[in-house]
Amino acid sequence: MKLDVLRRYRAQLEEVLRMDLFILRQDLLDAEAISRQLDAHLRLTTDAYLAKAGEGVALDEFLVWQSMVAAETSKLAAARQVEGRLRKAWNQKQDELREAMQDRRKLDRLAERMRQQRHLVQHRVDQIEMDEAARRASMM
């Protein structure tokens, strides 16, 4: 496989990883916002229950409050799990992007070295041709 083809492939891979990372970041921001909303709602529900409990509540009303708090706690836990999975995926994608960028830089350095080597060889060939032309001219 030619080096230029490999370099283009690595650049495309890097761009795909950047797009994936952007999408994951957006999803993570959305998940964080949902978690914050659920947490705030749970706090409001808990505060309302505590205010109501200060006045005294019947058993059936207590059970209703308890089920509401349990449901909201469950939703919050699920949202935080989603947030954790997205954060882990985002960190992994960052690592993949970092690795792809390093690979591309290695290929870029290799291409530059090869270009310099070709330039050096061409310079030597030109010098040999000039020396040969000068030798012929001096012999005449």
Predicted regions and their residues:
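Charge-rich amphipathic alpha-helical interaction elements
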Residues: 1-140
